[in-house]
A protein has these predicted regions:
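Basic, amphipathic alpha-helical segments enriched in Lys/Arg and hydrophobic/aromatic residues
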Residues: 291-328
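Short, basic/hydrophobic alpha-helical segments
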Residues: 38-55
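Gly/Thr-rich phosphate-binding beta-strand-loop-beta motif of the actin/hexokinase/Hsp70
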Residues: 2-22, 108
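Short glycine-rich phosphate-binding loop at a beta-alpha junction
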Residues: 53-64
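Short, glycine/acidic-enriched loop or turn micro-motifs at the edges of active sites
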Residues: 14, 62, 86, 216
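Long, charge-rich intrinsically disordered scaffolds of nucleic-acid metabolism proteins
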Residues: 80-199
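Short glycine-rich, Thr/Ser-proximal phosphate-binding strand/loop in the N-terminal lobe
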Residues: 13-38
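Phosphate-backbone recognition surface of nucleic-acid-processing proteins
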Residues: 208, 214-292, 296, 328
């Protein structure tokens, strides 16, 4: 082969990243680089000593992978950003007994080679979507803090500690209110975001906050090729078990996906399945599952998946929700 394809595993951290290139003979070449623009350029110089065609694989690690993934994409290198759970399962099947950054980089290169036809191809999100995603994550963090402080308040007896915690609760509430206002301004300042939020809000069970969460992760509808891919990304696809006489038994959902989407959709799905909005457009869908003897949690999860697939279709088609089109 004149121009062989090299699989590259990248184990990335805050300050540096380990890179392992899998050679044609199955061995690996390893090197460490700084996680900054200078390190990215040095990486490119090193990769060019092997060839011209690469497929780089890295795990989604907070925000540490984003700059490098964007840089490699700009260099026209194929990049895959995978869920850490996928590589963790691969590590177990590969019987790796040690765990170091170097070993992890080699493992990711092997993972890329073995799963070459199933790897998701990385597409950078727009600056507006990235800003929305980061603000939304901060909002989720503040809400968790607020819940924790409220729980602590019920366990305190010292008056000074109670007063301190109450002040903290007031402060966090103010921060949440200010950030929610900023998120609305962020949406209104971008015509694409504004239009997509408006479209998603036409879906029963989807309000502004849920629409923002969905757009922050799903994008404008072009990130995934179809609704099934979006549901897979959200970790809402069925997990099938096939062993012995138990063939193709559904044992739950995969949960290998974006948990923020599942959290955002749980309450809306619960309310529209069994709560105050149970006589909604989803009633026939829910009744059909009840008649099949499905438990409540299974039905709620199924409706969550339904909402994701509808949201993806609405964004992809750039069409408002229509009962005849989206509930066939």
């Amino acid at each position: 082969m004149d121009n062989p394809l090299y699989y590259v595993g990248i184990d990335i951290a805050k300050a540096k990243f380990d890179v392992a290139v899998k050679l044609q003979n199955g061995k690996h070449k390893h090197k460490v680089f700084k996680n900054n623009p200078e390190g990215f350029q040095t990486l490119m110089q090193w990769l060019n000593t092997f060839g011209e065609t690469f497929h780089c694989v890295m795990e989604a690690t907070n925000i540490y992978h984003e700059a490098l993934a964007d840089f490699l994409f700009q260099q026209q290198i194929t990049v895959s950003v995978i869920n850490p759970k996928c590589s963790a399962n691969f590590t177990k099947t590969d019987n790796l007994r040690s765990k170091t950054d170097k070993i992890d980089a080699k493992m990711l290169a092997d993972y890329a080679d073995e799963k070459r036809h199933k790897l998701p191809i990385y597409q950078p999100i727009s600056p507006a979507q990235r800003e929305l995603l980061r603000k939304n994550r901060q909002l989720d963090h503040l809400k968790k803090q607020l819940a924790q402080e409220k729980t602590r308040l019920t366990m305190l007896v010292d008056s000074d500690c109670i007063a301190s915690t109450q002040q903290m609760i007031v402060f966090i509430k103010a921060q949440i209110k200010a950030l929610e206002k900023t998120i609305k301004q962020c949406v209104n300042a971008d015509n694409t975001l504004k239009n997509n939020v408006k479209l998603l809000c036409t879906i029963p069970a989807i309000g502004f906050a849920t629409a923002v969460q969905l757009i922050a992760h799903l994008g404008d509808g072009n990130r995934f090729k179809n609704a099934k891919a979006a549901a897979t990304f959200a970790g809402l696809t069925p997990m099938i078990k096939s062993s012995g006489k138990s063939l193709n038994t559904v044992i739950g959902i995969s949960k290998i996906g974006q948990s923020d989407i599942r959290k955002a959709l749980f309450c809306p799905a619960m309310n529209f399945a069994f709560g105050c909005y149970k006589n909604s457009v989803y009633r026939s869908f829910v009744l059909r599952l009840l008649e099949c003897g499905k438990p409540k949690m299974v039905i709620i999860t199924a409706l969550m998946r339904k909402l994701v697939t509808i949201a993806q279709a609405v964004l992809q088609k750039q069409t408002a929700f229509n009962l005849d089109t989206f509930m066939k």
